[in-house]
Amino acid sequence: MGIRLLIGSLVLAQALTAGYPLIEIESPPDYHRLNDFTRTTISNALPDLKNLVLSDTIHIRYKIVSSQAGFRSAVGAGLPHWANAVTLFPQKLVVIQTPDLSRTTLRDYRTTVIHELVHLLQGQSVPLNLTPVWLNEGLAEFYAGEFDYSERVVLSRALFRRRLIPLNNLERVLTFSHPRAELAYAESAAAVEFLIDVYGTETIRAILRGMRDGSDFGKALEQTTGSEYADFQDHWRTYLAHKYNWIFLLDIQNILWLIIPGLAFLAFVSIRRRNKRTIRQWNDEETQAGMDEENN
C-alpha cells in the first residue's frame, strides 16, 4: 500500500471558478471517487473564499493518503494524534487522510477539505506565521461551517465557568489536549465571527491587504477596525458575554439535569396529593360505615 501511495494517481482538473489555476490532487489508485469528490468540494467552495485571495497566482495542491505511514512520511512528526490533515508551506500542499483512515464520515471529510483550503489560500496571501493562530484557525472554522451548535455550547460553558483561553495563548493550540483544543477552535471562530458581524464582510480582506502592504497584524487590525489589539480583545469578550453566556443551558444534558429534578418534585407532590385523597376517601368510607351500623 505504501508503494501504491507513493506512485499514486495524479489528477489535474480545471477549477470551475474563473481566474483560478488547476486543482492538483494526488491520491491512491483505489480512491478515484474520493479524488473527484475532493475536487468538486474545492471548486464549489472557492467563490465563497474570494476575500482570502489577494493574488492572481495561487496553487491548489492536495495529497490524499490512506495509511498512517504515508501521512507521517508526508507531514513529518510533531502533530497531535487528533490531527488528520495539515497544510504545508512553503510546499503549498494540503495532506489529508482518507475518511476510512481518519474514521470520519464523508461529510466530516468535506469539512476538513474546506478547512485546509482556507489555510492554503490565506497562506498564499499572507504567510500564516505572520498572522495569529486564532485568526488562521478561526477563518478555517468559520468558512468550513465548523462553528456549529456544539462549538457554541463549548464556548458558552467556558464563559460560564470563567475558563476562556486568552487569544494570545492560542498560539500553542497544537500542544493542547483535545477538549482544550476544541475550546480554542471555538474561541477562534467566535473571534472571526465578531470581526465580520461588527465590522463587515470586507474586514478580513482589508486586514490581509494591510499586512501584505507591510503592516503587522496589530497595525492592520487597528487601521481596519479603529481598535487597538488589546481593546479589540476586550470588545470581543463583551460580545461573547452578550451572545453566548447562557447558550450552554440549551445543551440537552443540561436540559435533562434541569428538568429531571423538577419532574421528580412534581411526581412527589402528585403522589402525596393522591395519598391524601386516598386516606380521606378511606376515612369517609369508615365514617359512612360507622353511621350505617348505628342506623341498623
Summary of predicted features, one role per range:
Residues 2, 155-156, 236, 273-276:
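Generic hydrophobic, helix-prone segments enriched in Leu/Val/Ile
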Residues 1-20:
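Hydrophobic secretory-pathway targeting helix
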Residues 86-93, 107-111, 125-198, 202-250:
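Acidic/His/Gly-enriched intrinsically disordered linker/tail segments
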Residues 244-296:
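C-terminal single-pass membrane-anchor helix
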Residues 19-132, 217:
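Juxtacatalytic substrate-recognition/specificity segment
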Residues 64-70, 98-108, 160, 182, ...:
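Noncatalytic linker/hinge segments flanking ATPase motor cores
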